Amino acid sequence: MTKKVQHRLPRAAAGLTMVFCLSSTFAHAQDTANPDSQDLPNMGQQITPLAPPGARFEPMNPDLTANPSWLAGQAVTTVASPDGKTLLVLCSGLNVVFTGSLTSRITSQFVFIYDISAHQPVKKQVVQIPNTYNGIVFDPSGTHFYVAGGSDDDIHTVTLGSNGTWAEEQPTSPALTMGHAAGNGLSVQPGGTGPVNAQVGVKPCAAGLAISKDGKTLVVANYYNDSITVFSGGYGNWSKGTELDLRPGKSNPAQVGVPGGEYAFWVAVKGSAASATAYISSVRDREIDVVSLSGTPAVTARISVKGQPNKMTLNAAQSLLYVVEDETDTVDVIATASNAILETIPVIAPPGVLPTALAQYTGANSDSATLSPDEKQLYVTNGNLNCIAVVALGGTNSGDQVVGLIPTGWYPNSVSFSADGSWVYAVNGKSPTGANPGFCYSGGAPTYPSCIPANQYNPQLLKAGFQTFPRPTAAQLTTLTAQVAVNNRFSFTESAGDAAVMAAVRAGVQHVIFILKENRTYDQILGDLEVGNGDPDLTEFGQAVTPNLHNLALNFVTLDNFLVTAEVSNDGWPWSTSARAPDVIERQFPVFYSSAVGVSRGLSLDSEGVNRSVNVAYPTLAERQFADPFTPDDPDLLPGQTNVAAPDGPGNEINTGYLWDAALRAGLTVRNYGFFVDQTRYNTTTNTIPLIENPAADGIVVAYPTNVTLAPRTDPYFRGFDNAFPDYYRYAEWAREFDNNYLVPACRAPESRKPAPAPTALPCAPHSQTARRSTGMPSLSLVRFMHDHTGNFSAAIDGVNTPDLQVADNDYAVGLLVQKIASSPYANNTLIFVLEDDAQDGGDHVDSHRSVAFVAGAFVKQGALISTPYNTIDFVRTMEEVLGLPPMNLNDALARPMADIFNTTPSAWSFTATPSALLYAPRVSLPLPPQPTGLVVPKPSHDATYWARASEGMDFTSEDRVDPAGFNRLLWKGLMGDKPYPAGPSGMDLRHNRATLLVRYRQSLKEEGRRN
């Protein structure tokens, strides 16, 4: 047997190792003698899918002729045939693979078909489906199965032929289509090179599927139409579908504007055609809608549940419905005869496995459940804990509990059993990504040199896993449970040293400023830094573009082993603001981000307060339409203020699981500058919010909040995400409030109708008694500086209209804010935390998640290189500890604060913001300090016309609507010239001999005529 490699390397060297070990585990899937772990460095966890005795763990290879080694991602649903001999595995995610050129790609989802008649799975076939979203079901005959078509708004029928091959049937008449012109929502569509137009309606999305016992009734959940469609007649004789809108106001005028039935996701059907009943999980409204299918479908009951209902399963007698719920991490057992909830089963861990201090927290992301054939156990997948919870069912519907945990791959989504119940089949959606320096895609102008796409975009690197093992015995479960506890660090306690450091920092710090930025990797920004493990060959926005970020790293701490937890902005904002991404986001983002590589599969960016682009922070239709006149005139469109993607707070207080909620619960103060702001009306052809540099001077509101808690705490004059608007003016608005509201009169800067030039240090003596938690500056300030995202070059104002200028603008805004605090009375009791929400927009030689992070203030070490492996969750936990806040969920409760970056006593510090020389270009009209004598102003790599032409057709209306892969390649070509894009991962530790490395790098810049 091949001995597998241990994973106890420092993260700086782990990028290459992670890729090798993942491949090694798959290649030697039957070797279970040494079930070594795989690290998840961006999560602080490890996985051990080979831990169950007799386990196999293998990739999902669809055997594409054009790319035989490519592996599918996001396995989401398993279903066994009625005779238990065949297993289907549905992959529903990004799954776009380039096969040699820009125009040659496969854009399919996949159904893997396995023979499990002899327990060990044998792959027989892979069927390609254009689009899908979780839903798949066998016909009771076992000779057909149905797959919901996602944004295609249809159902695919796949039939077993006489030759033993499965094939999709061509649509019959009438076809199994739902006939939706659009979903319920607001769609923001790009309008060519100019402004955008907001349009009513989003793409539909066919999700869960269920069929009656006799095969005569088929029900599909219409996720974005808040409805179900019912087909009658059976295979070969299906009638045209009948739709039932599940929203109360659509069937009862007295209930117009009452929430209910929205985000219909999963379906279970009880009974046969003549008397069938459907149960539908409404994710947003936290209810199970009970629908009678006799005659005209009608809602007969709504069963309220505490969590977000996900997948469901019926027992064989169809007397009990098991509903898995995220947010609560529970399973509700519902009696189908009475619609009563008989019991609620916690499914995080067996009693006593979690330390008492952790028992109050949730965050397991429970997402599916399957009954064993003997119905003595219920297997529940806990996505965020990478395990299956085994629930012992006593038959009394009371006192059932978890008796063990089984390790799985990363983010399990579904599990099935063999017919006799002796074997288990589990699938997961993710895998470690490793390095991605070859993130390569030829985008932009057609004259650019072509490039073979490397399929290294972050979500493309997330590969599905298929785990199979004999059903564990009770004794084996004990061992496996202990392994899950180790994998998730359930026994973690903060060391005495860390606790002492954090206590000292907490005692001296009263204010935290949290700056959130966009999408950059470590190598893109700090690859050319004098210290640390950076690769200058991957540096696109180096010292010449980002002098302030470089100075922050050198003056304070260089975090060269910091990994963001998220893959993209859709999950990046939840991870950055709440230390978790709910299952609804984990399920949606891989499908949504197919648009990032040129394939639209629908869904929306729900993680910043809008749901389907509708601002649900406002309680009434009139208020919504005042904030956004594009809002459809429909009181039943997502009524109420529930945000489907927001995490819960303690005690499952709905939607209050964010960092600012925790601060407010602790009696602290919060001010918001740009977080959770509606972007719909930026750059529109009508109803536009104007691009003005100083909206406060004219009293023009430019920020309409999308979070209920933040709404009264949001600066209405601080513009949200908009690439056309420089971060300098965002800083200026923050500084206006700071000067006017948080300084004593002698320290205030004068008011101005135009932003003043960057101020010098204010001659104010510290007045520490004024700058306390109870008065003065807020305890927690949220500041969004987003211009490092770059884009929208044709509309950008004040000449800040190229990528390097926009990143330089972002860098200067960060520097100005740090300078402002450094020269203020708050210098000694404030910490400034700077984070990227994700690292999707570039390559890195260590890990695709490695990014920049900065911390500044009196308690931060100075001139230190810190290579401790930290991640976003640790970052959030650190801010919590500084503010004296308890953890929000299991993730941050198990995180280690970043104590290595702090001293226990404050040090004097200062900071002077330095504009990049690029910003002194003649066409840039930002109010900068006087140009230093002798400063040579380099020309930007290209002018705005070049960048506008190269990015024509790209959608910059919101983060991540643009094709990141194409945009990254466009940036590389425009900034780096003809320098070849790196071909593959190195994983090298480049901390040593940096002086020699950088001399060679700078010499190459001169030879190539570039600056960086």
In which residue ranges do the predicted regions lie?
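Bacterial N-terminal signal peptides
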Residues: A13-S24
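N-terminal pro-sequences and low-complexity stem/linker regions of secreted or lumenal proteins
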Residues: L462, T478-N1012
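Bacterial N-terminal signal peptides that target proteins for export
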Residues: T2-A14
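Intrinsic low-complexity/disordered segments
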Residues: K3-K4, T25-A27, P759, P766
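Predominantly soluble domains enriched in secretory-pathway, periplasmic, or organellar proteins
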Residues: S24, A29-D498
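Basic/polar N-terminal segments that are highly enriched at the extreme N-terminus
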Residues: M1-V5, H28-T32, N1012
